[in-house]
């Protein structure tokens, strides 16, 4: 059996096969080597993940390569390269005593951001790297942070031993790693070797030899589709979801700690989940663009992947909005424009800057949402991203849209459908800028019960 040890300071490359629905879809590599950095003895940790999966009927090829330089158990530099369908994002993070200075190159668009350094946990580039560095988990809980290169944000993780499970006839208590985005289970042998890794989105990793891991993935037909694997089918079945004006659901999942309430979504905690009541927004008078901008200045600012201060974005937003001064009408003009110029393409597996989205005019819901939010802010419309679930055909899929402040309410706008009506089948799980809206929880063991539909 090939295993990966959690013993700190491993100096050899270790390989995993990556599987989705039992089919191998890629491989992962972890290695730690000795090096010299700034004249000091250091450790260089590298992780590489290569994936070939399906997404909404498209084929997605993706590579994530990261490197961390650590001196005396303290990270000094992290580098990430994410590539998919000819697009790349590179992130270099340099650590000081108090902050992280991150430089981002997203498809040629350069930006910088500063992240305060947390005081309650170390920072790693991957949970397996974190456990390698802190192998003594037995009998206690570990807290640490993962640097997410997609959102350029820190994700607080908690690791602890779970209840024992049967693993090929052997009773093993997995190490459970809770991340805001998903839950990972790491199964260890009695010697502390990793024998399997499972995630809440159905992706599994198993140790392989180098030759096995690098062996070409055979084309067996349709690739496993991540959108279908993570889809949630409610009971009873939804009728005519796109014309739904009110929906009351009971949502439960192993890792669902809470959900945001808002002007059109109300949340109540129940014994085994959350009761969610969603009302379709109605056309209401809204305030002027200047009034709304004055009331919500925070949501006018440019942020990661949302370059609303770019002169080209400002000029385009002005052209779309024209002489319109009503916030809701201006937002609908932008939503309609984005829908008219974009073509769905799920083959690009990385988050992209709005400039690149506008240039290529292809993408998935998150690309539509990023471009819509950027143009709204460029037009001085307060806007934030929202993500969660939506049902267009009776099944709930993960989705993204935007919300615009129209004077008294945050009104949702979805640029994917051609029709302007926003159905009550949008279930919001997170909101904000990219770092929070797209760090939502992928639900584990999710169940949705339809309590009422109108």
Predicted regions located by residue number:
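Bacterial N-terminal signal peptides
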Residues: 1-5
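Active-site rim recognition segments
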Residues: 205-218, 292-293, 336, 378-381, ...
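Acidic, serine/threonine-rich low-complexity disordered tracts
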Residues: 9-111, 129-285, 437, 444, ...
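Catalytic cysteine-centered active-site loop
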Residues: 344-347, 351-352, 385-395
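Secondary-structure boundary elements
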Residues: 123-124, 288-363, 371, 433-438, ...
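Solvent-exposed loop/turn segments at secondary-structure junctions
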Residues: 85-86, 181-182, 341-344, 365, ...
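Acidic/charged, solvent-exposed loop-and-adjacent secondary-structure segments enriched in E/D, K/R, S/T
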Residues: 106-122
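Catalytic cores of peptidoglycan-degrading enzymes
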Residues: 347, 363-380, 385
């Amino acid at each position: 059996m090939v295993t990966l040890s959690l013993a700190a300071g491993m100096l050899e490359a270790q390989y995993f096969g990556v599987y989705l629905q039992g089919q191998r879809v890629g491989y992962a590599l972890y290695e730690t080597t000795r090096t010299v950095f700034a004249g000091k003895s250091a450790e260089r940790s590298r992780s590489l993940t290569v994936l070939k999966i399906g997404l909404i009927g498209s084929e997605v090829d993706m590579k994530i390569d990261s490197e961390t330089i650590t001196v005396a158990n303290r990270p000094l530099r992290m580098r990430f390269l994410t590539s998919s369908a000819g697009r790349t994002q590179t992130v270099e993070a340099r650590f000081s005593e108090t902050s992280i200075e991150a430089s981002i190159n997203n498809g040629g668009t350069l930006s910088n951001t500063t992240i305060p350094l947390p005081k309650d946990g170390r920072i790693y580039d991957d949970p397996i790297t974190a456990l390698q560095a802190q192998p003594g988990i037995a009998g206690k809980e570990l807290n640490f942070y993962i640097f997410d290169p997609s959102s350029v944000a820190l994700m607080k993780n908690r690791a602890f031993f779970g209840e024992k499970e049967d693993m090929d006839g052997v009773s093993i208590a997995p190490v459970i790693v809770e991340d805001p985005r998903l839950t990972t289970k790491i199964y260890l042998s009695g010697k502390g070797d990793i024998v399997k890794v499972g995630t809440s989105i159905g992706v599994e990793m198993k140790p392989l030899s180098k030759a096995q891991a690098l062996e070409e993935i055979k084309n067996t037909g349709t690739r496993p589709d991540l959108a279908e694997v993570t889809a949630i089918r409610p009971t009873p079945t939804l009728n005519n979801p796109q014309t739904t004006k009110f929906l009351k659901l009971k949502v439960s999942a192993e890792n669902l700690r809470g959900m945001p309430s808002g002007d059109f979504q109300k949340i109540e905690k129940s014994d085994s989940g959350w009761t969610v009541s969603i009302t379709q927004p109605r056309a209401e008078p809204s305030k002027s663009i200047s009034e709304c901008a004055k009331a919500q200045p925070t949501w006018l600012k440019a942020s990661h992947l949302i370059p609303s201060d770019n002169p080209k974005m400002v000029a385009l937003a002005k052209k779309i909005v024209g002489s319109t001064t009503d916030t809701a009408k201006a937002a609908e003009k932008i939503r309609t424009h984005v829908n008219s110029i974009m073509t769905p393409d799920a083959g690009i597996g990385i988050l992209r800057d709005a400039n690149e989205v506008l240039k290529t005019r292809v993408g998935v819901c998150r690309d539509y949402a990023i471009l819509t939010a950027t143009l709204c802010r460029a037009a001085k419309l307060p806007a934030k991203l929202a993500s969660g679930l939506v049902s267009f055909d009776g099944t709930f899929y993960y989705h993204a849209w935007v919300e615009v402040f129209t004077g008294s309410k945050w009104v949702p706008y979805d640029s994917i459908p051609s029709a302007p009506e926003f159905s009550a089948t949008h279930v919001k799980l997170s909101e904000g800028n990219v770092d929070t809206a797209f760090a939502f929880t992928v639900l584990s063991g999710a169940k949705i019960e339809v309590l009422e539909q109108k």
